[in-house]
Amino acid sequence: AEIWLEQTNATGGILGRKVEFYQEEETSPKDTVEKFRKLTLQNKVDVISGGISTAVGLALGPVAEELGQLWISWDATTQKGVEETMPKTKYSFRSTDNEMEAVGGAILTAKYFPKVRTVAGINNDYSYGRDCWDTYKAVLTHFNPTVKFVLDLWPKLGETEFSSHIAAIKKANPDLLFSSFWSGDTTIFFKQAAGVGLFQKMKGCFCTGGGVHDTLKKEFTPAGLILGYNSFYFKWTDSWPLLKWFVNKYYTKHKEYPPYEADHAFFTLQAYKAAVEKCYAIIGAWPSKEQIAAVLTQIEVPSISGYRGYTEDNRMRCNFFQGITTHKNPYDFVTIDPVEIMDSAQIQKPAWTKLYDWIKSWKA
């Protein structure tokens, strides 16, 4: 967000207006709603960009509609499980569906590891972990009807001791382990798994683990696993100038390579700017929030992960990046090669469609 803000204001702002930036920290749903109301009613901001957790998204969606406040989410959705609780929002623009990386992970499991017959899962015991596991099982079963799921483990979010879980996995001896770990628990799990050689023969699919990519050091993170980076991978191509510019800016500023949240922030603000400018080109005046909201689903803008936009039911459309881990790179952490780029049309259910109905509609 800061890089976008600096660049935008340095090049004239939005229609000649300098962008003013207010920042609040996301906490509990209740407290975040209070901050959302403050930004809207006291600070009178034009748009609110952000939102990470599903619980916060479920709380913010109705408030945004009540206040008529444009809310352009990063990660947060208004899904309960895999079902959309607010299918026809006007001012709330949600992130991608929570289960997209699990869909992609299952597709790549079938592609790269077609001989897998038994699968275990270790996922955090909350909605995202359970949704990803259920989705992965449904999609993999579509491609591999004889696969058996032999173990499912549910450590609490924030768990740091996985020795008992790893022992259970070794005992079950599956062909592949699936996980939707997405934060520091990914790194901790790999360190502890390396100590007992868990992946010497076992395959793995960590559909969201790339969110902490620069902590996944080669010394304990195996090559040959499926690793997902959500909707941004810092080396997805050498031919997208915006990517090179942003990665260089981010690395200079933070001395690390950007995670996927950086692109959520960049895109949501870039989309807002483009919508304002499109409205202005039509009406010749600064548009209302209602007018901007009506245009957001009609635009596609270049972001650092490629072109991104919104579906007709206000969900983000973008690429997702997964691939096979490799140690053949100049870094001290793993990267992926090949890089599989999957767009929303491939791994996100269409507008007004239920997830499992969509999966059942696929051809064999």
Predicted regions and their residues:
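Extracellular/periplasmic periplasmic-binding protein-like sensory domains
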Residues: 193-267, 277-283, 325, 335-363
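Stable alpha-helical elements in mature extracytoplasmic
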Residues: 1-4, 32-36, 44, 48, ...
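Extracytoplasmic ligand/sensor domains, especially the bilobed periplasmic-binding protein
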Residues: 45-154, 203-227
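Short, well-structured alpha-helical segments in soluble
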Residues: 22, 26-46, 109-112, 160-173, ...
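Hydrophobic alpha-helical
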Residues: 54-65, 161, 167, 174-196, ...
